[in-house]
Swiss-Prot record:
Residues 71-81 have a biased composition (Basic residues). The keyword Cytoplasm applies. It comes from Hordeum vulgare (Barley). One of its GO terms (molecular function) is structural constituent of ribosome. Transmembrane segments: none annotated. The keyword Phosphoprotein does not apply. Residues 117-135 have a biased composition (Basic and acidic residues). PANTHER family: 60S RIBOSOMAL PROTEIN L24 (PTHR10792), RIBOSOMAL PROTEIN L24 (PTHR10792:SF1). One of its GO terms (biological process) is cytoplasmic translation. InterPro entries: L24e/L24_sf (IPR038630), Ribosomal_eL24 (IPR056366), Ribosomal_eL24-rel_N (IPR000988), Ribosomal_eL24_CS (IPR023442), TRASH_dom (IPR011017). One of its GO terms (cellular component) is cytosolic large ribosomal subunit. This is Large ribosomal subunit protein eL24. It is found in: Cytoplasm. Pfam families: Ribosomal_L24e (PF01246).
Length: 162
């Protein structure tokens, strides 16, 4: 049979079922205290870190060394090794890393210029297409100039204040 033990919010002691004092604050936060001493100290706003019998004090002042030693585990370190990235071999990457910054900057500038030209070209094509469409609409006699009838009054509950 397993007993569900809880911890005292002040002292850090184990509280077994049927024991302890439960305090529910006005903001619905639940506190469970081991005994009236813990409850009294909590309501008097004493800090558990300053009382030498609480778990918080013992932890801060490194009194439970045997419990802390069990937690320390060696972290496995990964050995670094070089591997190629998909789409580029290790030689290509090393070659790019070795080239001078001026060459790299020039290549970047050329690529940016090419991208800007492509964007400008697509914009010009869109403008030309739009101009053609507007020209054809005007020549058809103002097909798009038909006025719509005004909408009637809105019906239904708006749900506003009354």
């Amino acid at each position: 049979m397993v007993l569900k033990t809880e911890l005292c919010r002040f002292s850090g002691q184990k509280i077994y079922p049927g024991k302890g004092i439960r305090f529910i604050r006005s903001d619905s936060q639940v506190f469970l205290f081991a005994n009236s001493k813990c409850k009294r100290y909590f309501h008097n706003r004493l800090k558990p870190a300053k009382l030498c019998w609480t778990a918080m004090y013992r932890k801060q002042h490194k009194k439970d060394i045997h419990a802390e030693a069990a937690k320390k585990r060696r972290r496995t370190t990964k050995k670094p090794y070089s591997r190629s990235i998909v789409g580029a071999t290790l030689e290509v990457i090393q070659k790019k890393r070795a080239e001078k910054p001026e060459v790299r900057d020039a290549a970047r500038e050329a690529a940016l210029r090419e991208i800007k030209e492509r964007i400008k070209k697509t914009k010009d094509e869109k403008k030309a297409k739009k101009a053609e469409v507007t020209k054809s609409q005007k020549s058809q006699g103002g097909k798009g100039a038909v006025q719509k009838g005004s909408k009637g009054p809105k019906l239904g509950g708006g749900g506003g204040k009354r």
